[in-house]
């Protein structure tokens, strides 16, 4: 999606673009990362597996489908390009939820009384259900949820484990580009400090 007059995934800070920062973060926490988007636009992501939507112009639901289609994993974490504040603690938390609820097709967090479908776990077995929704032009991102088994992670549980306000912050909710770049830079520096054993 677009904001600040351009694709928000391409906003730059710390010598990299937002999508590159998110990709590196995911690549450090998962065995394989698939980027769904334009190969030409994201060609700077060296070593990344980039796949273009199988169903064009069908929105985020088509992105979920494409990611699952090219994945070889039973369980898949899917996120948007506008949530750079997800971290390894959250990823490990979701992996533990998979261990506890291995049969659930969807493991999704709830925040502010809404499910967050682009920070969730999806089983590859959902492919047929999602494809049917796309072919029927039911393009709401959660169109297949009612016919799928899911574990909803309560907001209370999330709050006990995370700084939920920051974790759930989306780029699209920030109005000022400079504010966004400053926030991203701060997060980047904190993570670099943690990597080298340096505290704030």
Model segments located where?
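Glycine-rich phosphate/pyrophosphate-binding loop and the adjoining helix
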Residues: 157-193
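Acidic/polar hotspots within intrinsically disordered regions
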Residues: 196-199
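Nucleotide and nucleotide-moiety/phosphate-recognizing core
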Residues: 1-138, 143-164, 191
């Amino acid at each position: 999606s677009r904001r600040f007059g351009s694709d928000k995934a391409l906003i730059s800070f710390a010598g990299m673009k937002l999508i590159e920062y998110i990709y590196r973060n995911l690549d450090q926490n998962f065995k394989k990362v698939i980027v769904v988007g334009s190969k030409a636009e994201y060609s700077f992501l060296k070593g990344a597996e980039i796949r273009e939507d199988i169903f064009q112009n069908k929105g985020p639901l088509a992105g979920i489908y494409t990611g699952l289609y090219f994945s070889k994993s039973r369980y898949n974490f899917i996120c948007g390009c506008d949530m750079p504040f997800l971290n390894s603690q959250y990823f490990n938390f979701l992996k533990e939820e998979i261990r506890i609820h291995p049969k659930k097709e969807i493991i999704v967090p709830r925040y502010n009384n809404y499910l967050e479908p682009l920070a969730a776990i999806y089983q590859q077995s959902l492919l047929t259900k999602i494809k049917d929704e796309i072919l029927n032009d039911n393009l709401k991102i959660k169109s297949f949820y009612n016919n799928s088994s899911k574990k909803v992670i309560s907001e209370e549980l999330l709050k006990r484990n995370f700084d939920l306000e920051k974790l759930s912050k989306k780029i699209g909710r920030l109005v000022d580009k400079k504010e966004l770049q400053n926030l991203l830079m701060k997060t980047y520096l904190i993570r670099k400090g943690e990597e080298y054993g340096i505290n704030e």
